[in-house]
């Protein structure tokens, strides 16, 4: 109670939380409550409080009329097995293993991973590790063989981070300061090595039945 009163009375204050409160049973509620507290205490988007970032590009604050948002839809569908609600067109990764191992219509039988290791980074990791072994086919775009990619039928190596230019569109959405840094490649890339975008475009064409010789 004392902490709540001090927070409400403080001239400047901010409540902040990310992965620790978001990867639990009521993670969405926790994330919403954090922002609700900042709003109710008058600490939203003001100096000393919880401010909106305005990155150079890639976010809701970089386009459209300032101060107005259109919101987003959620709950338009549910996962097949445990009926977990959709949010922003995605389902919780906690449902992935059960969607692979549970027979029935629309059962997941194939998987593509890109530079990730969900066997270590997601809930029900042991169950997911076992489930990946049951897939009919799995492709990983990665430069490492790790706990996840070891299950892949094919590993397609993309250029390393030192061989690519870089502008961090995603993380600047959470930046403490509004910055824009662009990095040129450190190493010269082999021209015969396709970029991740080229690999994904080629795979998309193959998945659409255009064949392995399709031109992305």
Whereabouts are the PLM-identified features?
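Non-catalytic alpha/beta scaffold blocks inside enzyme catalytic domains
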Residues: 1-36, 40-46, 54-216
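Active-site-adjacent alpha/beta core region of enzyme catalytic domains
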Residues: 51
